[in-house]
């Protein structure tokens, strides 16, 4: 029997305030002890928020490997929209995603965001394949535009998932590129974080960046260290169209494992 679709009312009656909005969260697990979690509006606010907390062999345990993903959409009109992101110290918090989020739902326990921007409808879907330290983030143009340019900036801070966000960010991250394979490497102890981008005109623009003084509002409210830095290798981009989805895959698994499960297969396997 298929699991029911659970729809979360949005805008909600408590979505007017920033703190209340950031309290609306999601969580997905991978069957290994790893997980992904975040707020519905895409702002990281806890030390546990991230796209991939990998369950690694001892002595590492659960490690935050893929912290955040800033999403931008550029329309043929030239208009640019940002979804998600970070709150920065001294900068007013903007939750642009909240203005355009028409619906959030769970399909078979997996989160789906439905955005309405200009005349277009775009859906984002997140899948953690069972038994893998991997995450698939899929974007689909449902209707309303011939094409939309998608830009994705991932950022990382490899750390134990319970460690404070203020822990020092290592300066030795290295980006390794070979054809369509991208790896973020930090020394020899932890596995690299590997990326694949499926989509039309998919590529990476190398633009290394240290994102400083991110505020984790829920950590701050709880009295814990609440400011930290992330490192980004650059940004991926692809073109969305009526028959052209895009999927970013991030994983600590080997390349054979990543290539062995296509995005459509990952979605079908979890439904």
Identify the residue ranges that each predicted region occupies.
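Terminal accessory carbohydrate-recognition/targeting modules of carbohydrate-active enzymes
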Residues: 1-271
